A protein has these predicted regions:
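Anionic-ligand binding patches
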Residues: 1-123
Length: 123
């Protein structure tokens, strides 16, 4: 099974920041704006892809001051996260509007995966 997530803002892919400076820059871009978290999954068996799934969540971030951003980063240290936030921790409080699955936002659309596994009697 393979899973990956891509954060997209204004037709730009926002990579995992890796450090505080890039994290601040990303959050400043997203502040007050709408972006998308895209989650893709695939299952392969015997050298064949037997299932794929793709889901998108739409998120609108609150307006954040530099102090807000620095306070948030000090709590969650989201340096290895698409979009520079950990939605499952304090990141969820950064948003004014969210459309889509929290699992897609977190990078694993578990709902779609479980439906597939149940329908095919893997679980």
């Amino acid at each position: 099974m393979g899973v990956d997530q891509v954060c997209e803002f204004n037709n730009e892919i926002l990579n995992k920041p890796g450090n505080k400076e890039k994290c601040i820059n990303t959050l400043q871009k997203l502040s007050g704006n709408t972006h998308f978290q895209n989650c893709g999954m695939a299952i392969a068996f015997n050298d064949s892809i037997i299932w794929t799934s793709y889901d998108v969540a739409k998120l609108t971030m609150n307006e954040l001051s530099l102090k807000d951003i620095e306070n948030y980063i000090s709590k969650d240290a989201p340096y290895m996260c698409c979009g520079s936030y950990k939605y499952e921790l304090n990141g969820k409080y950064l948003f004014s509007d969210v459309e889509g699955s929290i699992y897609t936002i977190q990078g694993l659309d578990i709902d779609s995966l479980l439906i597939y596994l149940r329908q095919n009697k893997f679980i």
